Each structure stands twice: as structure tokens, then as C-alpha cells.
């Protein structure tokens, strides 16, 4: 893909004060408080920390509750593809592999989109992180906001700071966004293959060792 580097976000709603940073936004959920979860707003803040000049597309696939469906995610991803997103951040994981989501991921990957998703540090595989071509990211307490670790695929491909931009919230979902943000920052200046770029940027290699 060529042209302007645009980042797509699949998440919950975004508060009005941050909506001005969005190139376009579309809701794929029914009525409800558009940003009551706060998660989508936290994701936007992380992206602005890493790549403040990068255009952002926002597909709201979560409503008032922390729930979505493979059909909603697939519809949002298809829209982001049609709107020209090059990098897509998916800071969530669904328990089950579903054909509709698998096919949407395959179409996006085939179109040259860079797909980043969160993955748990322990436990069963989740989706879309479990699909081929998706960069899987888990939280790594060793990493600051601008640092990543190369984990070699188990439990994830990369680790990153598990905190939001304010340091108040934590989880693998924010780690994925830090990686997507670093990709957006650096791919504005280079045509390097995404995984090769992340390997080069990695400060740590191998899994985080936690003492009992």
C-alpha cells in the first residue's frame, strides 16, 4: 500500500474532546453512551502520544458494555479497509474463532494492512490475535511507553508497556496500542517490513521473567 499512512482503531466510543483528532468515525453498535467505557479514548491518547500527526480512523464496535461480536468487528474492519487504513489496532480478544472474522482478517492482510491485536500473557488463544498475519502483543512490565520486547511468538510476538498514556489503566490492550503507535511513528519515515522494524526497535528479547 502507498500514500498517506492512516491508522484505524477498532474500539469503544471516543469522547468529544478527542473526536477532533479523528479523520473519520463510524459506529457499528446501537444507541448508548458513545464513550462511557473510556477505553476508546485511552486508545486514542496512546496513539497521539506516539504519532500525533497520523490521521486516525475510528470504528466503534463496543457499546456501553465491554462486549462485541465477530460480525461487528468484521464490519468495522471492512470499513477501515475501504477507508484506506494501513495500520489497524485491535485492542481486544474474542474467545472463539469465527469464519466471518477470519475472512475479514484474511482480506485485510491480503490488502497489505498491518494488523495489531492484543494477546493474553497466559491462557488460551484469543481472536483476532490468533489469526495468521496478525501481530500479537501482550503487556510487558519491563517496557516503558516507547519500548518493546521481542517475545518470539510465545505467548505473543511482542510485548510493550501495559499502561495507558496517563499510567492509570493497565492491560494487554494498551500494550497493543503502544506497538501500533510505534509502527505509525516509524513507518512514516521508512518502508521497512513491520516485524523487521519491531525486531530492530526491541529493547528486550525473550519472555519477561517474574519472580514468585
Model-identified regions with their sequence ranges:
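C-terminal subdomain of the subtilisin-like protease fold in secreted/lumenal serine endopeptidases
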Residues: 86-87, 188-212
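Active-site core segment of subtilase-fold serine proteases
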Residues: 1-50, 54, 138, 209
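Mature extracellular/periplasmic domains of secretome proteins
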Residues: 1-2, 48, 68-89, 98-113, ...
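Short glycine-rich anion-binding loops that position phosphate/pyrophosphate groups of nucleotides
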Residues: 14-15, 92-95, 121
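Structural detector of well-ordered beta-strand residues that form the stable sheet scaffold
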Residues: 57, 114-116
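Subtilisin-like peptidase catalytic core
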Residues: 31-94, 203-209
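Conserved protein kinase catalytic core
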Residues: 17, 66, 97
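Extracellular S/T/G-rich loop segment that most often corresponds to the catalytic His/Ser-adjacent loop
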Residues: 5-13, 124-188
Amino acid at each position: 500500500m502507498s500514500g498517506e499512512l492512516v491508522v484505524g482503531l477498532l474500539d469503544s466510543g471516543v469522547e468529544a474532546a478527542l473526536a477532533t483528532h479523528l479523520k473519520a468515525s463510524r459506529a457499528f453498535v446501537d444507541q448508548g453512551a458513545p464513550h462511557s467505557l473510556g477505553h476508546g479514548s485511552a486508545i486514542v491518547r496512546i496513539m497521539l502520544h506516539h504519532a500525533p500527526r497520523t490521521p486516525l480512523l475510528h470504528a466503534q464496535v463496543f457499546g456501553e458494555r465491554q462486549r462485541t461480536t465477530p460480525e461487528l468487528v468484521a464490519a468495522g474492519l471492512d470499513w477501515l479497509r475501504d477507508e484506506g487504513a494501513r495500520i489497524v489496532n485491535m485492542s481486544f480478544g474474542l474467545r472463539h474463532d469465527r469464519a466471518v472474522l477470519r475472512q475479514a482478517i484474511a482480506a485485510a492482510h491480503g490488502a497489505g494492512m498491518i494488523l495489531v491485536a492484543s494477546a493474553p500473557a497466559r491462557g488460551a488463544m484469543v481472536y483476532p490475535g490468533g489469526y495468521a498475519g496478525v501481530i500479537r502483543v501482550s503487556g510487558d512490565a519491563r517496557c516503558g511507553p516507547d519500548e518493546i520486547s521481542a517475545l518470539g511468538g510465545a505467548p505473543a510476538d511482542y510485548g510493550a508497556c501495559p499502561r495507558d498514556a496517563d499510567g492509570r489503566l493497565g492491560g494487554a490492550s494498551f500494550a497493543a496500542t503502544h506497538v501500533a503507535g510505534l509502527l505509525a511513528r516509524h513507518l512514516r519515515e521508512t518502508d521497512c517490513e513491520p516485524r523487521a522494524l519491531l525486531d530492530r526497535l526491541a529493547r528486550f528479547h525473550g519472555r519477561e521473567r517474574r519472580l514468585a
